[in-house]
Swiss-Prot record:
Record-linked SUPFAM superfamilies: Homeodomain-like (SSF46689)
Main function: Transcription factor required for zygotic genome activation (ZGA), a critical event in early embryonic development during which the developmental control passes from maternally provided mRNAs to the expression of the zygotic genome after fertilization.
Tissue specificity note: Specifically expressed in early embryos.
Location of region: Disordered: 1-20, 54-86
SMART domains in UniProt: HOX
Family: Belongs to the paired homeobox family. Obox subfamily.
Source organism phylogeny: Eukaryota, Metazoa, Chordata, Craniata, Vertebrata
Name recorded for this polypeptide: Oocyte-specific homeobox protein 6
GO cellular component, one term: nucleus
InterPro entries in UniProt: Distal-less_Homeobox_TF, HD, Homeobox_CS, Homeodomain-like_sf
Comp. bias regions, Polar residues: 72-85
GO molecular function ontology, one term from the record: DNA-binding transcription factor activity, RNA polymerase II-specific
Primary site of residence: nucleus
Organism: Mus musculus (Mouse)
Compartments where located: Nucleus
Length: 347
């Protein structure tokens, strides 16, 4: 011990020197090797056991991956050596998870701020709606402002109705005078007149449908009260052929069918502007119309105990005015001929 303290390089006995060297200098050399070259044994450790992956705190974060089996040493500013482990063929290809961890460097992992910025960029900027401006939309709907309703007394209503019957659209001066008289504002007077006009119009529309059924009922009553004892429908066709079917009283000729092939040419009983006299219809006589040559007319006279209540139907002839202006026998002569024919057939 004394020799080592004085000069460790003095020649000594080899046996003592070896003992001293084993006891004192060996731990120093081992510790020096462990501190100075901790990474030189890493390739050998990786070759022996590939599952063990040492992580050095001095490993560079900005490294370019290269296909190299040898480690690269670099001297930092502090003078300490640092090793850069590059992914290569040293690792077992059966470990994809470890390989992916080594392939991605720390600067390639996205940070939280970049993820947040990308998320906001995908959504776009939040812009307020131009319809609302700077106001914020609230989920709670605001309550509607209820209008104040003016309540009028009976005296005020009477005054207003009296003026309404005189003038439904009062002028501004009249509204001001009514406002002073009633004790309200001119705007309230205008609102009252507007509402009262709408009310009166609604009531008038409701009364119109109620009046229509009454008029229909009165017309039906009038039509039922009018009664003709013996009525005869008369129908004139467009081509000049006509047919009458009449109902006569009990003293009439029973069930007669009469037809005539030939007839005097061009005459009519009732033209387009003249109706047959009503007295003939009331007396039970049937009028006869004129026909052209070569056309036949069938007159059917039917009798019955009951009196038919049918209105008289007249259809004007569509022949030209020259037929209406032709000269022919009068109506009385025609009736006389018909009665004579009936008497001959009855005998």
């Amino acid at each position: 011990m004394l020799q080592y303290n004085q000069s460790p390089h003095m020649p000594q006995d080899p046996s003592l020197h070896s003992k001293f060297q084993m006891s004192s200098s060996a731990p120093i050399e081992i510790s020096f090797q462990m501190h100075q070259e901790p990474a030189r044994n890493l390739p050998f450790q990786m070759c022996q056991s590939p599952l063990v992956i040492p992580r050095s705190p001095m490993q560079s974060s900005h490294s370019v991956p290269e296909r190299d089996l040898c480690p690269q040493e670099s001297q930092g500013p502090s003078g300490k050596s640092s090793i850069q482990m590059q992914p290569g063929l040293v690792m077992d290809p059966a470990l994809p998870i470890l390989r992916s961890l080594l392939m991605h460097s720390p600067h390639q992992i996205p940070s939280r701020s970049s993820v947040r910025a990308g998320f906001q960029g995908s959504l776009g900027p939040m812009v307020r709606s131009p319809s609302y401006g700077d106001r914020r939309v609230s989920l709670v709907t605001p309550r509607k402002h209820r209008k104040i309703r003016t309540v009028y007394t009976e005296e005020q209503k009477c005054v207003l109705k009296k003026h309404f019957h005189k003038c439904t659209y009062p002028s501004r001066e009249q509204r001001m005078a009514l406002a002073v008289l009633v004790g309200v504002t001119a705007n309230e007077i205008q609102i009252w007149f507007k509402n009262h006009r709408a009310k009166s119009k609604r009531e008038s529309l409701q009364n119109v449908p109620a009046a229509l059924p009454e008029t229909n009922g009165s017309s039906e009553a009038v039509s039922e009260s009018v009664h003709f004892p013996d009525s005869l429908p008369v129908v004139a066709s467009a081509n000049g052929e006509s047919m009458w079917s009449g109902t006569f009283g009990e003293d009439s000729i029973p069930n007669l069918n009469w037809s005539q092939e030939s007839s005097p040419p061009h005459y009519q009983a009732c033209d387009s502007a003249r109706y047959c006299p009503q007295e003939y219809l009331l007396n039970g006589h049937a009028p006869v119309t004129a026909w052209n040559s070569g056309q036949s007319v069938a007159v059917e006279v039917q009798t019955g105990l009951a009196v038919a209540e049918a209105p008289v139907v007249m259809v004007a002839s569509t022949q030209g005015p020259e037929y209406a202006q032709d000269s022919g026998p009068s109506t009385e002569e025609l009736w006389q001929r018909v009665l004579e024919d009936f008497d001959e057939l009855g005998d």
